[in-house]
Amino acid sequence: AASDVYKRQVFIAEAQTLMFACRETEPGKVNIIGLKDKVLLSGRSHVETEFVIRHLSPFFPFFIPASNLIQTSLENIGSIFHPSVVLFNAATIERNIPFYFYRDMTPKIASFIEKLDKERIEVGEAFGQKLMPVSDWIVYAYPSTVGNTLCERMKNNPAYYDILAPGSIFTRQLTEDIPTGLIPMSDLGKAVGVKTPLMDSIITITSSLLNIDFRQKGRTLLNLHLDRLNKEQIIDYLS
């Protein structure tokens, strides 16, 4: 009966990132450049996580169970990679000078990304999560990646090799990764007394650059109605 459909339990889960490295070639067509080997996934509970993975694994075998939604949220590596590269190349992007987003990586920007990543890892530690550094994650997700440093690995990942930089600074790599990635990471840090000065700097500068108040529009604990919870309550709510 139709009424039975509405009584069925719906399981909602999130992955740490998109399973594909891909780009739209034209409306309705996507070029899949690479496929990640492992992607963390979590539901609202361990039971829901196991249920979702069990039903998705015949079609998407690369999903790995995460401990909770805090882990999948903080393992959003794109939020560490994307804003840094776009921000430090904003003038080049505005001048419409094409360059490769990863292949043209430089040691200094890669070093900044690693410093930014340390803030993410410290926030994770405060919530009981041992997060994977970005340099290790590239090899974890893309085993064919070669290189010893983060810079070398970003330049020598076959899935990244031909990905061009965006054509505008109004790109999802800022307009999505700031409000849905760096904002909640920064806010979780504030909730447990972990300072995130580099994250906060990127958020502030990008908000001014694009004239978008990301703090007002982003996924803050206030906007998610989690601002009155302590650390243990946040962990319990997201586990």
Model-derived features: where do they sit?
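Short, surface-exposed amphipathic charged segments that create phosphate/polyanion-binding patches used
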Residues: 25-34, 79-84
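Glycine-rich phosphate/pyrophosphate-binding beta-alpha loops
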Residues: 20, 107, 176
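Short, small-residue-biased leader/transition segments that mark boundaries at the very start
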Residues: 1-6
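Short, acidic/small-residue loops that bind anionic groups at enzyme active sites
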Residues: 8-18
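NAD(P)-dependent Rossmann-like dehydrogenase/reductase catalytic/cofactor-binding core
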Residues: 110-239
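A short alpha-helix capping/helix-coil boundary motif
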Residues: 30-33, 99-100, 161-166
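A short acidic, often aromatic-flanked loop/helix-cap motif at beta-alpha or helix-coil junctions
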Residues: 18-23, 72-73
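Active-site-lining helix/loop region of Rossmann-like oxidoreductase modules
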Residues: 39-137
